[in-house]
Amino acid sequence: MQNFYDDNVQDNNVIIDKSTENKIFGKTFFWMFLGLLGSAIIAAYTYYSGLIVDIVVGGSWSVLLIVELAVVIIFSLCFRKLSPTAVGILYFLYSMINGVTLCTVFAVYELNSIVSLFMVSALIFAALGYIGYKTDKDLSSWGTYISIFLIAGLVLSVLNLFIFKSSGLDLILDWIILAVFLGVTIYDTNKIKALENDPSIDTNKVHIYCAMQLYLDFINIFLRILSIFGKRRD
């Protein structure tokens, strides 16, 4: 379960230039698409080339997860201080590493199921993004509740993995986490307007920050839908 939040943004009731806002939204979704495309290609190559075996047997899996987490932390904590080039490099580095870790999806689920549910996830994500974009209401108050639910979901998932080991609880958690990220997508899309009005953020890189947020939202929605409805390999 992955995401991070920056609630230090100004009230998005400020009137902004719609052409500028639309430009930022366009760049955001373009960068998000590039990240997802890169992750998908890397994931498929890692699995079908057999590289996944070398990674697991060689003990590199835990290292990749640590590096992946480190990149997210650096990205979120140092975003304001980093240059647009550095931010872009971190974003693509994360999407590439995440592509490697996502290769297990191909090992667990049938390809037809992966493709079809990816499309379903994309349609749901697009609808939620549209709602967040068109909503004029300030949704910044959602941030606290989202963080609480995400932390609770993470803790319960870890407890279920090592202690409870309940498939029933696992399914319930999948539904809860999915519901949370559906709300997160609306929240993050709406937050782009507020970020546009934050004078402390470089407009040359804010779209990359937003792309990372939405990338994480989509990946989590897709993984939850795949876990609930995906057809597993025999």
Residue ranges and their predicted role:
Residues M1-D234:
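A hydrophobic alpha-helical transmembrane-helix feature that marks the membrane cores
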